[in-house]
Amino acid sequence: MKAKIHPKYHQAKARCACGNEFEVGSTSENIRVEICSKCHPFYTGAKGRLVDTTGRVDRFKKKYGLS
């Protein structure tokens, strides 16, 4: 392996939009995610209650007449 070409590896803090924080290994020091295992419907068991902040689901339903 060549010396001094690899990025530095950090224990990074990942912050979710819901406020949850957890540590992961990454080349970045801070990571921001929109959804994590604390707020994702698959892990919480809340089917059909996904928070849609941009209105994409509503626009899709309106466009295809699914609402």
From Swiss-Prot:
Protein name, UniProt field: Large ribosomal subunit protein bL31
Superkingdom of the source species: Bacteria
Matching NCBIfam families: L31, PRK00019.1, PRK00528.1
PANTHER family: 50S RIBOSOMAL PROTEIN L31, CHLOROPLASTIC (PTHR33280), LARGE RIBOSOMAL SUBUNIT PROTEIN BL31C (PTHR33280:SF1)
Summary of the function given for this chain in its UniProt record: Binds the 23S rRNA.
InterPro entries for the chain: Ribosomal_bL28/bL31-like_sf, Ribosomal_bL31, Ribosomal_bL31_A, Ribosomal_bL31_sf
Record organism: Syntrophomonas wolfei subsp. wolfei (strain DSM 2245B / Goettingen)
BP GO annotations: translation
Gene3D superfamilies: Ribosomal protein L31 (4.10.830.30)
Protein family membership: Belongs to the bacterial ribosomal protein bL31 family. Type A subfamily.
Binding site for Zn(2+): C16, C18, C36, C39
Subunit structure: Part of the 50S ribosomal subunit.
Cofactor(s) the protein needs: Zn(2+)
Key words of the record: Metal-binding, Ribonucleoprotein, Ribosomal protein, RNA-binding, rRNA-binding, Zinc
